[in-house]
From Swiss-Prot:
Signal peptide (UniProt feature, chain positions): none
Localization per Swiss-Prot or TrEMBL: Cytoplasm, Cytoskeleton
Record PANTHER family: PROFILIN
Positions carrying N6,N6,N6-trimethyllysine: 104
Species this chain originates from: Acanthamoeba castellanii
Protein known as: Profilin-1A
Record carries keyword Disulfide bond: no
A Pfam family assignment: Profilin
GO BP terms in the entry: actin cytoskeleton organization
Site (Actin binding): 116
């Protein structure tokens, strides 16, 4: 399955996230949903935050033109919030999954979808 298929089917296609991307551990975009553009600098900031989250804990982070307040940040997951919408990011051994949800979607529902796909990819060696 292609990275784009994971974005279109396993993330956005579930209805639990409205936009999604898969990034490499270097922050470069491998696949993205239409209209969701994560810049290389934003991807690199996110990727480095999995090793040292202090900068994003203090000031939040930006993805695709939206500034998020950091709710959770550890070596596996970074959760951000903007009003009643937010973003779930999860690191696997070779990639970073990004799922954005809007105010109509429960954060836990979005987190469940992104975390489960991450678990699957980790199990597959990715």
């Amino acid at each position: 399955m292609s990275w784009q298929t994971y974005v279109d089917t396993n993330l956005v296609g579930t209805g639990a996230v409205t936009q999604a991307a898969i990034l490499g551990l270097d922050g470069n975009t491998w696949a993205t949903s239409a209209g969701f553009a994560v810049t290389p600098a934003q991807g690199q900031t996110l990727a480095s935050a999995f090793n040292n989250a202090d900068p994003i804990r203090a000031s939040g982070f930006d993805l695709a033109g939206v500034h998020y307040v950091t709710l959770r940040a550890d070596d596996r997951s970074i959760y951000g919030k903007k009003g009643s919408a937010g973003v779930i990011t999860v690191k696997t051994s070779k990639s970073i999954l990004v799922g954005v949800y809007n105010e109509k979607i429960q954060p836990g529902t979005a987190a469940n979808v992104v975390e489960k796909l991450a678990d699957y990819l980790i199990g597959q060696g990715f």
